[in-house]
Curated annotation (Swiss-Prot):
Name of this chain's protein: UPF0182 protein Gura_0902
Keyword terms, alphabetized: Cell membrane, Membrane, Transmembrane, Transmembrane helix
PANTHER family, alphabetized: UPF0182 PROTEIN SLL1060 (PTHR39344:SF1)
Subcellular locations according to the entry: Cell membrane
Record GO cellular component, one term: extracellular region
Transmembrane segments: 6-26, 50-70, 103-123, 158-178, 201-221, 248-268, 271-291
Pfam families: UPF0182 (PF03699)
InterPro entries membership: UPF0182
Similarity field: Belongs to the UPF0182 family.
Length: 892
């Protein structure tokens, strides 16, 4: 008896504990939403989950119980049960009935609970359906507004699945009850089914046929989302064979179900067998066989003529899905010759060419500005600021706290003392010290500003590395930063976090984070607050799980000296007709939201950056208190929004094919582009400050070049504008197709083939240095192109500090390598004075440059001599011209 009680207690505890844990997480999540001010988001989501769960669960339970009620009321003379293929024994009717009823209720309850959980997972589809808007664009085949596909179809498909499952599960339950109670008897020659059972099953089969018919109807809509044709979406065979068949099946299936039900009702088994055979035959012929024959014998020989309307559909809707239809295409004649005057007139562009690559700069920042081992630079972000009155492109990296690198890891250190990172490192993208190191506008701890950028609130409590909770305003002083004379402490003064001073909250958070220390610590007082969801990516996802967030959050210094994170967010769908999907199935995407997180107090704000997006319109109706218009964003933050490079890369991958709007050109891939690669890695979009052709001033842009498919010359360059009032406008500048415009890979090959550069690289490698070749940047100036690539030197070991030692510049047929960008431009164009603030080469550097020129002259002379001996007088003459150019540069 005691043993049984102990087992019962264990079972009860095993059931209750997960429920209590979920309840604690639920309540502490509610406290998080109270802290952030988004309780309406929490309650709306909760109501949708509970409502959808109850709807599906209760509906299934009621349907099952009604059918079980009829099955339990039926009277049968006896209950026969067939066991082990031969033995048949009988049980009394009342004993079978007593067994069937509770088991049926239990099974229905279990199925209802599963339906509740499944239904709760459909909360987003429910909210989209109940708040849908009309888009105003119809699909070209069925004429439905695309809002039907985006907002209605997902829920309708879920309802169809639920209805089919409910009927099938109920049929199985009812069949089991009838079997136990004797309505179905298994004999050696088959099954004997009572007339009452047949009639009941006939009704269920008739209902099930309606769900199958609904499935065929929805499958017809789904053809526009399929990839069964040559081009994404419904093609000729889909529209003229499969769609017609599905329409026939939508009507035929209920009729077949009615005939099948009638056959069961009357016991006419032959009549009952014919309808499903007919439906299967129509499906096999109309969906599989006939379309395949149509494709092979009619479509394939005349594919372009027959598929042209459907190619137009996929072009149109793919461009709509990825916002490509707003890209403006502009011819770009790159045959104009640049002069020294052109370079001087584009001084702001030249001064903002990004020489510092992210990876070398991150390593350099880590070694120069990490200060202590427990600080870490996770990433380097690109932005632009008005620095001392000049529009300047900068690199910024937050100095976050790395708990993995704390010298002494214990609960008090990790949760009460070391609570935050401190400050930023901030400098221009193009300026280099004499030692080949970056210059700084803001550096050190406490922050030292060498420009008019001030950081007055440097503490970073919320960041990309802040993955654990901390407790602030405790009796233990928080560590702020180290100095030569000792550590400086601080006390949190922000509004972030949840009060944890009460015994109840201590107990709740101790349970949530599975540590008794929160409950027992004497350092936690009445004013203490617990900060959780501190990872900014996790924080925004907790509030808006229906959005996708960019993987590259970036930090901004506000005018008041505070630090803010800006995270790009995307609305998306996989339900846009005819739009080609990505690998994950998404075929509609917009960068419609900018999320801002305060690094000090964790406050969250979501701004709508694309009010024309239909998805964000619906989410705005669902969560009216979540979003604010872009006009509400403070000016000091709005001037730092930028077009996300990950989104432009995605758009570029699609635009490479879908810039072709002529179906014939698209079909033949006559003008297919691709993103150029250097090595195995495709080029990524990069930010730069430059003056667009025809514009009067420089602006902050995101740029990416294209090459023709399987060729290396340039075809176009794509740029997204980041500054107001032109934010979000994308331009595609196309090069003439009748002449060669060097592409990145061709320039890279010319660099590798340059004898002087290759010899210098070999020499550095032989001396134990690692040569790191930076990103190849294509810089449009006026109507010409400059190619710029920085070279970094670092010691071959892992601790090597990357130093920017050379800059390669290519223009036209010339490729030069110099210590600075200024010197490289002077070699090509001559006569340009270095702008104020740029680093001038020292006499030693000039001497080294002269020595390099001398070595280059000797190399050219040796090649000329060899060509003379071989009798190659044309090659000999070319080498003499090169030698003459080098001697002129030496004479400057």
């Amino acid at each position: 008896m005691v043993k049984n009680k102990f087992i019962i207690i264990l079972v009860v505890v095993a059931v209750i504990l997960p429920f209590i844990s979920s309840l604690i997480n639920f309540y502490t999540d509610w406290l998080f939403f109270v802290e952030t001010g988004f309780t309406s988001v929490f309650t709306t989501t909760l109501a949708a989950k509970v409502g959808a769960g109850l709807f599906f669960g209760v509906l299934l339970f009621i349907f099952a119980m009604i059918n079980l009620h009829f099955s339990n009321r039926a009277k049968f003379p006896q209950t026969n049960i067939f066991v082990e293929g031969r033995n048949i024994y009988q049980v009394k009717r009342d004993e079978a009935a007593r067994l069937a009823k509770p088991l049926g209720i239990l099974a229905s309850a279990i199925l209802a609970i599963l339906a509740c959980k499944w239904g709760a997972m459909q909360w987003q589809n429910v909210l989209l359906f109940t708040n849908m808007v009309t888009v105003g664009t119809n699909d070209p085949i069925l004429g439905k507004d695309i809002g039907f596909y985006l907002f209605s179809l997902p829920l309708l498909e879920m309802l169809k699945i639920f209805a089919g499952f409910t009927v099938l599960a109920t049929t199985v339950l009812v069949g089991a009850v009838y079997y136990v109670r004797g309505g179905i008897t298994l004999m050696e020659r088959g099954a004997a089914i009572d007339v009452k059972v047949r009639k009941h099953l006939a009704v269920l089969i008739g209902i099930f046929s309606l769900t199958v018919a609904a499935g065929f109807y929805l499958n017809g809509c789904g053809l526009l989302l399929s990839g069964s044709s040559t081009f994404h979406g419904a093609g000729y065979a889909d529209v003229n064979a499969r769609l017609l068949t599905l329409r026939i099946l939508t009507v035929l299936t209920p009729l077949a179900g009615a005939i099948l039900a009638a056959g069961l009702w009357q016991g006419a088994w032959r009549l009952a067998l014919l309808p499903p055979i007919l439906v299967i035959a129509v499906y096999g012929i109309g969906i599989k066989a006939y379309p395949a024959l149509l494709e092979k014998f009619k479509v394939a020989p005349n594919q372009l003529a027959l598929e042209t309307p459907y190619i137009e559909n996929t072009i149109r809707f793919t461009r709509l899905g990825y916002d490509l239809d707003k890209i403006e295409t502009i011819p770009f004649d790159a045959d104009v010759k640049l002069t020294a005057a052109d370079i001087a007139n584009n001084d702001a562009t030249i001064k903002n060419i990004r020489l510092w690559d992210h990876a070398p700069l991150l390593k350099t920042y880590s070694q120069l500005q990490q200060i202590r081992t427990y600080y870490k630079f996770f990433d380097v972000d690109n932005d632009r600021y008005l620095v001392n009155g000049q529009y300047t492109q900068v690199m910024l990296s937050p100095r976050e706290l790395s708990y993995d690198d704390l010298p002494s890891r214990n609960w008090i250190n990790e949760r009460l003392i070391f609570t935050h990172g401190n400050g930023i490192t901030f400098g221009p993208v193009s300026r280099i010290s004499k030692e080949g190191l970056p210059e700084f506008f803001v550096k050190d701890i406490p922050a030292v500003s060498l420009a008019d950028i001030k950081v007055t609130r440097p503490e970073i409590y919320y960041g990309e590395l802040s993955n654990e909770y901390v407790i602030v305003k405790t009796k233990v002083p928080e560590f702020s930063y180290p100095t030569a004379t000792g550590n400086i402490n601080t006390t949190y003064g922000g509004k972030g976090g949840v009060p944890v001073g009460s015994m109840l909250n201590k107990a709740l958070f101790a349970a949530r984070f599975r540590t008794e220390k929160i409950l027992l610590s004497s350092d936690i007082g009445s004013e203490s607050r617990i900060l959780y969801y501190r990872n900014i990516n996790e924080r925004v996802r907790a509030v808006a799980p229906f959005l996708r967030f960019d993987g590259d959050p970036y930090m901004v210094v506000a005018d008041n000296g505070g630090l803010k994170w800006i995270i790009d967010a995307y609305t998306y769908s996989s339900r846009l007709p005819y739009s080609k999907p990505l690998k994950g199935g998404i075929n509609y995407m917009r960068n419609s939201v900018k999320a801002v997180v305060d690094a000090y107090d964790g406050s969250l704000t979501f701004y709508i950056s694309d009010p024309d997006d239909v998805m964000v319109k619906v989410y705005g109706r669902i969560f009216p208190e979540l979003f604010k218009p872009m006009a509400a964003m403070p000016d000091d933050l709005r001037k730092h929004i930028r077009y996300p490079h990950q989104f432009l890369q995605l758009q570029a991958a699609m635009f490479a094919a879908y810039h072709m709007t002529d179906p014939k050109v698209f079909y033949n891939k006559e003008n297919l582009w691709e993103i150029p690669s250097l090595g195995d890695k495709p080029m990524e979009p990069y930010y730069t400050i430059m003056k667009l052709p025809g514009e009067k001033k420089e602006e902050y842009l995101l740029l990416l070049p294209f090459t023709p498919s399987k060729r290396d010359n340039l075809a176009a360059w794509l740029t997204a504008r980041c500054d107001a009032p032109n934010y979000g406008k994308i331009l595609a500048y196309t090069f003439p197709r009748d002449r060669l415009i060097y592409g990145p890979k061709q320039i890279d090959a010319r660099i590798n083939q340059d004898s002087f550069i290759s010899q210098q690289l070999t020499l550095w490698n032989q001396r134990g240095s690692e040569v790191i070749r930076g990103s190849m940047l294509v810089i449009p100036i006026e109507k010409s192109l400059l190619y710029v690539q920085p070279l970094f030197l670092a010691a071959a070991d892992k601790a090597g500090l990357p130093e920017l030692r050379r800059v390669i510049v290519a223009y036209g047929d010339e490729v030069v390598m110099e210590e600075t960008l200024e010197l490289a431009l002077q070699r090509i164009f001559g006569g340009r004075k270095a702008p104020a603030g740029s680093t001038q080469p020292t006499p030693a550097a000039m001497k080294a440059s002269s020595a390099e020129l001398a070595r280059e002259a000797m190399s050219i002379f040796e090649r000329a001599t060899n060509l003379q001996r071989q009798g190659d007088w044309a090659g000999y003459g070319e080498e003499l011209k090169k030698l003459q150019q080098v001697l002129r540069r030496m004479a400057q």
